[in-house]
Amino acid sequence: MSLFESVRSQMPAEIPSQLERMDAFWTSYRQSNQEIAKVVQTTSEKLGGKDFDAIICGGTLGIFIACALQRRGWRVAIIEKGILRGRAQEWNISRKELNAFLELDLLTEAELETAIATIYNPARVGFQGGKDLWVRDILNIGVDPVYLLEVLKQKFLDAGGILLEKTAFKQAIAYADGVAVEVALT
């Protein structure tokens, strides 16, 4: 078994097909065969009533801002093409960045500590043929994204946020007083 086959066999079932789709997209894009769809229209007409103060496309990173806004009284919806969940690979971050979750009252101390999977110091930064640089407290904390996103997702929903999973963004129309968003089930 080749190294590629070995690594691929250890991936969750959906990952190889997702990687193949992304690779095909970027190959087509590099060859200038990728048509860029116009997805935002504008009009001077008025929309009238609004259902949300903010609509966020993409939940994996969008959940952070969505949860913060929703918990501050905004009416927020998230449009997520798949299911909003973290991947099985840790995210690296610094303590200073993590503290933003506490400052924004998105996580409790206990939740933050539970989200931390690994802490290490120092870290080596280097490039082939160059001199290694050892740094402390820079991207030295591994966070469990499965846990982190699930906690934020529940807090968002508990605060009244709307999560549209398996829903893709199609287009937006910018009116004089708001934006209408069209979606499609995936």
Give the predicted meaning of each segment:
Residues 1-53:
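Extreme N-terminal leader/targeting segments of oxidoreductases
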Residues 55, 59, 64-90:
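Glycine-rich FAD pyrophosphate-binding loop
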Residues 77, 162-165:
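General small-molecule cofactor/ligand-binding pocket signal
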Residues 83-124:
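N-terminal FAD cofactor-binding segment of flavoenzymes
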Residues 92, 133-155, 164:
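Short beta-strand to alpha-helix junction loop
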Residues 165-180:
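A conserved short coil-to-beta-strand element within the FAD-binding core of flavoproteins
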Residues 181-185:
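Short beta-strand segments that buttress and anchor functional surface loops
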